[in-house]
Amino acid sequence: LKNKKISITTKKKLLKEKEILLAGYNLFVTRGVEKTAIDDIVKLAGVAKGTFYLYFKDKYDLLDQLILQKSNEIIKDGLKKANSLGIDDFRKRTLFFLDYIISYLKENKSLLKLINKNISWGLYRKAMMKPKEYDEIKNVLDIFVRNLTNYGIQKDEAEMTLFMIIELVGSVCFTTIILKEPTDIESIKPILFKKILSMIGV
């Protein structure tokens, strides 16, 4: 009976956290982060303000968790697709994976705006420190770095290469999909992929 009560309490906590995350996401993509107050988030989530602080330090902590959660979901779906097609070659797998993410962001422009303005390498470092919560992110980062080190590249250089690819893809996606400059994403994608292949150099 005691375990059942604990289970119910845990479920309620997870539900409240989920409601706060959902409310935060909806407000961030419609109003923007700066124009969204914690009062707005808790009102939409239907929870007390004190409840918010049980899960998040502030709205930026909520934003970080949202970005990591969404990134984890996209990466998980991308991995499923790659696995279902049986793509094992590192270069082909990398390009397929990036193409999947680009296509997803193209269809979800609000998410692209949110991610592009607030993503950082430090955020992915945070994901590496919480492998249970963001297992897919950690898995992909580990595999990428390990593949490069297998080709004789130093681990530090492999991590910096990954950082540059994340920055490059994010910047190109935002500029071409949102600003539509200097061309559309489909036109620039072959050049982008060519540059990425030269960066990983394997």
Residue ranges, per PLM feature:
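N-terminal intrinsically disordered/low-complexity leader segments
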Residues: 1-15
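Hydrophobic/aromatic residues within well-ordered alpha-helical segments
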Residues: 16, 59, 70-74, 97, ...
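Helix-turn-helix
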Residues: 19, 27-61, 65
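Alpha-helical DNA-contacting segments of helix-turn-helix folds
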Residues: 56, 63-73, 77-78, 115, ...
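Hydrophobic alpha-helical connector segments
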Residues: 65, 80-107, 165
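Amphipathic alpha-helical packing segments from all-alpha helical-bundle domains
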Residues: 72, 76, 124-152, 159-163, ...
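Short secondary-structure transition hinges
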Residues: 103-142, 178
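Hydrophobic alpha-helical segments that form the core
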Residues: 155-178, 187-199
